[in-house]
Amino acid sequence: MAAQIHRLRDKAGETEKITINLGYVDLGHIDLLVQEGFYSNRTDFIRTAIRNQLLTHGEEVRKSIVRHTLELGLRHYTSADLEAVKAAGEKLHIKVLGLASIAPDVTPALALATIESITVLGALHASKEIKSALADRIG
């Protein structure tokens, strides 16, 4: 099965919303920097801070990706991909850093027959039925 790996770009449509809890003083510092024009808004500050930390730890992240044999970027699994895995009598251990997606035409039965485990550092896009069927295999 040929790998379909695509590098993710940071576009508005390719983001995942997160919620964080900050102390009042930290939030006040962020608001002050926004007010002074250092950042356009709180989100700009937080994204910049996260990118800076990722750059700081970039080498460690790269080594960890290699050590864990993670696919980097976008990995999409179609019904045809999983049918090929099933025909070969194999099972997948999916490991993705980025976005893993399972096509809408994949049935829960096909997913159960072909996916042994899923580890996603990022986001998993799949139907509610697929996520429910694979719940004990998602880690």
Identify the function of each model-found stretch.
Residues 65, 80-93, 104-117, 132-138:
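Short, T/G/N/S-enriched strand-turn elements that build extracellular solenoid repeat scaffolds
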Residues 124-125, 138-139:
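Charged, polyampholytic interaction/assembly segments that form long, compositionally biased interfaces
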Residues 37:
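C-terminal His-loop and adjacent cap/lid subdomain of alpha/beta-hydrolase
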Residues 55-88:
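Short, positively charged interaction helices/loops
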Residues 69, 74, 93, 99, ...:
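Detector for repetitive beta-architecture
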Residues 1-25, 34, 43:
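Short Lys/Arg-rich basic patches
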Residues 3, 8-10, 28-29, 40-64:
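Short, basic amphipathic alpha-helical segments that act as recognition/interaction helices
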